[in-house]
Amino acid sequence: MEEYLLSGESSNSGRTRRRIGSIFDRRDAIAHGSAYQKAAALVDLAEDGIGLPEEILEGASFEKAAELYFIFTRFDFLWSLNYLALVVLNFFEKPLWCSKHLAESCNNRDYYYLGELPFLTGAESLIFEGVTLLLLIIHILFPISYEGFNLYWRSLLNRVKVILLLILVADIVVYILFLADFYYLPFRIAPYLRVVFFILNIRELRDSFFILAGMLGTYLNVVALSALFLLFSSWLAYVFFEDTRQGKTTFTSYGTTLYQMFVLFTTSNNPDVWIPAYKDSRWYCLFFVLYVLLGVYFVTNLILAVVYDSFKSELVKQVADKDRLRLRTLKKAFSLIDEANNGHLNEKQCTLLFEELNKYRTLPKISGDDFKSIFSELDDTGDFKINLDEFADLCTAIGLRFQKEDSLPIFEACPNFYHSPASEKLRGFVRGATFEYIIVFVLLVNLVAVIIETTLDIQNNSGQTFWQKVEFTFGWLYVIEMALKVYTYGFENYWRDGQNRFDFVVTWVIVIGETATFVAPDGLTFLSNGEWIRYLLIARMLRLIRLLMHVERYRAFVATFFTLIPSLVPYLGTIFCILCFYCSLGLQIFGGIVNTGNPNLAQTDLAGNDYLLFNFNDYPNGMVTLFNILVMGNWQVWMQSYKELTGTAWTYAYFVSFYLISVLWLLNLIVAFVLEAFQAEVDLEASARCVDGDDKEAKSERRRNVGTKTRSQRVDFLLHHMLRSELTECSNENP
């Protein structure tokens, strides 16, 4: 789950040494117990924000605990895959309503308007749950082995996990009895718990929900004020239109008026709801125009402002807490090295620490040539001594991507051939700008070919076959490009670049796909028609986006886009989890109601708008339906239709609560965050241009100006820039 902050091998660290460190190397180093190794472990903990608790590092069994911890982290990918599998199980699990004694079996998918994903049988579902439960138990309880029970149970998060695990086990036992036909099971809590475990064990998601929990009080206050506005406006509308056509046809009661005015607050039924009044008198439009202006452009934006202000306050607390934890951890590392309590470190001590940091998987490889640069970076006072405040900048300094010499390609094993005049000339050509211009030209020609081939495909023109062959030819040109780059730079250096990784995967899939297309029998439609390879070739056109980075007016927009994607992932993931909760609830409340045999279905707006496929009969359809409601596309159709099908007004509570949480709260939060983050990124881009225009000699002395940041560093840097004034106030209040 972790990755290097700095890719590549250092120039003096040995050409043949593996760039990627081994967990066993770190475990063995820490197990042998020097102060510098413990300090390096603490710095690593400060860098990634996770790892061994500080209390363990002071214990007598630190080495054993660290060894068990590293064994645990070796399976990070497996743990992540298991939590993903827990969520995926919801999509394939057979809904409980299908187990009722139905007139028509759930196997008739058309009858119930079900999706296309297959259902797991009871036995298959139980096996799936059993395997994921076993891995879940191991992941939750294994930390006891290196933390100890007392320290483990002291954590509120661990206690919550254990309690939820016991509830999940009980739910599975009850489900087994249900499969044995002991009784009918109307409700399962497992679908909700799977998503909860997913949230609790994905740190970014967990932090997002903690922020939302801190905002809840402020949000409820502003929602209460909005509710007062809605109640008063609805009462005014009910009284005002009592004796008009509007009152006799639409605003027939206060409850009905309140419902219609609430939907109008979201503009989903505008202007349909006030057409009767408009027919009576054109002047009646003033009432509704004023209501929409106040509701949509004032109250809603007021909610947006309050939500984001509260969000920033909670985010500042979270970022400040992480900074304080980072500082406390670095202080421990500092004290371990400063055994004489001098209050400072000299260059030799820092050098020994950096040598230990070279063994860590989440920290960069630092060469001897870089030690002096980093030491100068930290030594703000210029006294050749590093105090605690200067040492606190260590994680930032060592996280920089210093320019390094490339590691040796494997072809250096044949120096006579690799360094021959022809080879040197070829490699020089590949490194040059001309080669990149040729590739860009090929991409542009490929784009034209794709457009022509796609147009002919739409027209069912036989000339499409020729252009498909042309596209296949382009695929092999990319193979040649990849081979030349690997030959020139070496595979390790080639793999460092994210674009190269994307090209490598797509290119090899194209090669394998083209081969399969030509050798596959005609009966295998998917392989033999070659259509799917075209979409991979189109995906390669995404490389053209990089051209926008060379256009000054677009650079800030493109850079902001790529920075905002990882910044927004936790909040988009939060919305996804909310959708999962509501989807599970929707299946249990509304599952099976929409079916061909329901006589009340034809009179609903679901049937009238041809929305029958958007239902809550299975998990995939439910998620798509909730997405449609999320984007506010005729969302009142589902609310009113399910109210009519269930026969109870309590149905409104489901849809209104979803609107309040997902649309009015979370989507507003994302909109505000994007606006603020974009402005911060534009400021950073402007600052970077100013730095680039400074004295080049000074820039070469401070090598950080030529570095780049990893994704997590960019997000962290962006957040600190966005919250710089609030963080300053927070640090002044809590010195």
From Swiss-Prot:
Known regulation of activity: Inhibited by Al(3+), La(3+) and Gd(3+). Up-regulated by H(2)O(2), cryptogein, salicylic acid (SA) and cold shock.
Membrane topology per record: Multi-pass membrane protein
Taxonomic superkingdom: Eukaryota
Glycosylated residues (UniProt): N460
UniProt cross-references to SMART domains, sorted A to Z: EFh
Keyword set includes DNA damage: no
Name of the featured protein: Two pore calcium channel protein 1A
Source organism of the structure: Nicotiana tabacum
Organismal lineage: Eukaryota, Viridiplantae, Streptophyta, Embryophyta, Tracheophyta
